[in-house]
Amino acid sequence: MSRTKETARAKRTITSKKSKKAPSGASGVKRSHRRWRPGTCAIREIRKFQKSTSLLIQCAPFQRLVRGVERQKEGLRFQSSAIMALQEATEAYIVSLMADTNLACIHAKRVTIQPKDIQLALRLRGERH
């Protein structure tokens, strides 16, 4: 096996514990925290959620909502698998509605969605008169 060439390393200076501590005058100066540019975290979140296949609505609150509707109707019962199917369908509907809403917002030359964008998306789908 051939030998690999080693490069010289810079020497480390050995310092005592006392010299490692910052001087008493410099301890009051705080370093500023680096912030991300506006929109960077949002884009990172969007990419993260688009990659994942997990459910976004928490299971317990959604199940409580379904059970509340179930209590209003007599003789209506749901299996846990039926509730999971309802949750999948609900999330798919909300995601597609938000995609249409975003298109309406972009069409209006805005970047922030507003209630009127959701109303327009619902009207174009024929779900609201």
Curated annotation (Swiss-Prot):
Q: Which GO terms describe its cellular component?
A: nucleosome; nucleus
| Cross-referenced PROSITE patterns | HISTONE_H3_2 (PS00959)
UniProt subcellular location: Nucleus; Chromosome
- Keywords for the protein's UniProt record, in alphabetical order: Chromosome, DNA-binding, Nucleosome core, Nucleus
What does the record give under GO molecular function? DNA binding; protein heterodimerization activity; structural constituent of chromatin
Q: Where is the composition biased (Basic residues)?
A: 10-21
UniProt cross-references to Pfam families, sorted A to Z: Histone (PF00125)
Question: So which residues are the signal peptide here?
Answer: none
Spell out the InterPro entries in the cross-references: Histone-fold, Histone_H2A/H2B/H3, Histone_H3/CENP-A
Checking Gene3D superfamilies in the record gives:
Histone, subunit A (1.10.20.10)
Enumerate the residue ranges of region (Disordered): 1-36
Family annotation (SMART domains): H3
CDD domains, sorted: HFD_H3 (cd22911)
Where is this protein chiefly located? nucleus
What quaternary arrangement does the UniProt entry report? The nucleosome is a histone octamer containing two molecules each of H2A, H2B, H3 and H4 assembled in one H3-H4 heterotetramer and two H2A-H2B heterodimers. The octamer wraps approximately 147 bp of DNA.
Role, per record = Core component of nucleosome. Nucleosomes wrap and compact DNA into chromatin, limiting DNA accessibility to the cellular machineries which require DNA as a template. Histones thereby play a central role in transcription regulation, DNA repair, DNA replication and chromosomal stability. DNA accessibility is regulated via a complex set of post-translational modifications of histones, also called histone code, and nucleosome remodeling.
Family named by the database record:
Belongs to the histone H3 family.
Protein's UniProt name:
Histone H3
